């Protein structure tokens, strides 16, 4: 039996509307991702890597539109998903680590609570059990003294440490696919 990809994008085209004009941002982009595989999308700055991958979690900007192709996941075309469909996929099955950790974290909420919320929502753990799992995730991503750091706010972390927190939030969901948009 042939191996089937977890996700398969075929000839995806994305257009943006800007000041009454159409801008073709992605033209006939395709990929297949298989279980256990690491796949890198490489290109120049501004080449559309982020625009393309945001479609795997339903986060295309409001002025953007998929104008061609398909993205198949679990036998369904994601280009046809409604917001309700995305609620069952985003985070739980496919998670994404965005480029800028400061725009991914809530500056008014402690780091640990942000990870804990992800665990509670996607793993179904509650209270102390979820808190313990959040502290474990901080340790797994290399945050020293995770018990103390759990109680701190994003501004108390370096840029690299904030990025690791965002990775912890995404990984805590235990997704089938983890998309990392320049997670350095």
List the predicted regions and their residue ranges.
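Conserved ABC ATPase signature
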Residues: 152-157, 161
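Hydrophobic anchor residue at the start of the ABC signature
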Residues: 115, 167
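ABC ATPase C-loop
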Residues: 165, 171-172
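Conserved ABC ATPase "signature" region
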Residues: 77, 129-148
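Conserved signature/switch motifs of ABC ATPase nucleotide-binding domains
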Residues: 91, 155, 173
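Conserved ABC transporter NBD signature motif
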Residues: 66-77
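The feature captures the beta-strand-to-loop junction immediately N-terminal to the Walker
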Residues: 42-44
């Amino acid at each position: 039996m042939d191996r089937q990809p977890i996700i398969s994008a075929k000839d995806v085209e994305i257009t943006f509307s800007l000041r009454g004009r159409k801008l073709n941002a992605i033209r006939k982009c395709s990929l297949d991702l298989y279980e256990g595989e690491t796949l890198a999308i490489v290109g120049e700055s501004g080449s559309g890597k982020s625009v393309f991958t945001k479609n795997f979690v339903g986060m295309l900007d409001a002025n953007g539109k998929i104008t061609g192709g398909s993205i198949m996941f679990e036998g369904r075309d994601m280009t046809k998903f409604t917001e309700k469909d995305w609620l069952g996929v985003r985070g739980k099955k496919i998670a994404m680590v965005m480029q800028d950790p400061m725009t991914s974290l809530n500056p008014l909420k402690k780091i640990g609570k942000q990870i804990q919320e992800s665990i509670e929502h996607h793993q179904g753990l509650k209270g102390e059990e979820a808190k313990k799992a959040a502290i474990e995730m901080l340790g797994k991503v290399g945050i020293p003294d995770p018990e103390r750091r759990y109680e701190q706010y994003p501004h108390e972390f370096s840029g690299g440490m904030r990025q690791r927190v965002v990775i912890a939030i995404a990984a805590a969901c235990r997704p089938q696919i983890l998309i990392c948009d320049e997670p350095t």
